[in-house]
Amino acid sequence: MSETVPAASASAGVAAMEKLPTKKRGRKPAGLISASRKVPNLSVSKLITEALSVSQERVGMSLVALKKALAAAGYDVEKNNSRIKLSLKSLVNKGILVQTRGTGASGSFKLSKKVIPKSTRSKAKKSVSAKTKKLVLSRDSKSPKTAKTNKRAKKPRATTPKTVRSGRKAKGAKGKQQQKSPVKARASKSKLTQHHEVNVRKATSKK
């Protein structure tokens, strides 16, 4: 009897272990893992491109200046130093960034002309166009004064020919009157001579 009891207890223990539910370790899908790994890299690249688009340095921003800009944006630069360097290298290889100085992750970087956002280009164009408009307006504001003075100077010239023409008309009228008056005088003289001759003839006939 002593030998059968332990065997029964052992079989009962094995059956109980089989009945217990086995916990399976859940595995995350591959897509979630890759996404979680890529998110910090994407955020770093976005922050770098934004910092370079805002900067007005023609030569480009150095690595130290980029780190300062990222720290000001709230990014932990000390913990993610290696990620910053890797993202810089990948952006240079993709052609998004241009390395103006240095080699590798050290040196100065700036955005390539193809990747400059349209907003910055439009702002630059607007500023240039606004400056040109101001210059044109200032020139135009000066030019009307000269135009007014020229108009004032031209007005007497327009009035003078009228006076000259009126004077010419008056002279022409006087000349015509003078030309007409000698004819009248001649006609009156001829009439007087005719009357005188008639009177003389009458006197001679009476004699």
Swiss-Prot record:
Tissue-by-tissue expression: Testis-specific.
A Gene Ontology molecular function term of the record: double-stranded DNA binding
Keyword flag Isomerase: no
GO biological process, one term: nucleosome assembly
PROSITE patterns the UniProt entry points to: H15
H15 domain mapped to chain residues: 40-113
Domain of life, per lineage: Eukaryota
GO cellular component labels: nucleosome; nucleus
Entry keyword set: Chromosome, Citrullination, Developmental protein, Differentiation, DNA-binding, Nucleus, Phosphoprotein, Spermatogenesis
Localization, UniProt: Nucleus; Chromosome
Biased composition (Basic residues): 116-136, 148-157, 165-174
Region of interest (Disordered), ranges: 1-31, 116-207
Principal subcellular localization: nucleus
Positions marked as site (Important for nucleosome binding properties): 56
Annotated Low complexity bias: 7-16
Post-translational modification: Phosphorylated in early spermatids. Citrullination at Arg-58 (H1R54ci) by PADI4 takes place within the DNA-binding site of H1 and results in its displacement from chromatin and global chromatin decondensation, thereby promoting pluripotency and stem cell maintenance.
Transmembrane segments: none
Residues annotated with Phosphothreonine modification: 159
Residue numbers bearing the Citrulline modification: 58
Keyword hit for Phosphoprotein: yes
Matches recorded under InterPro entries: H1/H5, Histone_H1/H5_H15, WH-like_DNA-bd_sf, WH_DNA-bd_sf
Family: Belongs to the histone H1/H5 family.
Function noted in UniProt: Testis-specific histone H1 that forms less compacted chromatin compared to other H1 histone subtypes. Formation of more relaxed chromatin may be required to promote chromatin architecture required for proper chromosome regulation during meiosis, such as homologous recombination. Histones H1 act as linkers that bind to nucleosomes and compact polynucleosomes into a higher-order chromatin configuration.
Protein name, as recorded: Histone H1t
Originating organism: Homo sapiens
Lineage: Eukaryota, Metazoa, Chordata, Craniata, Vertebrata
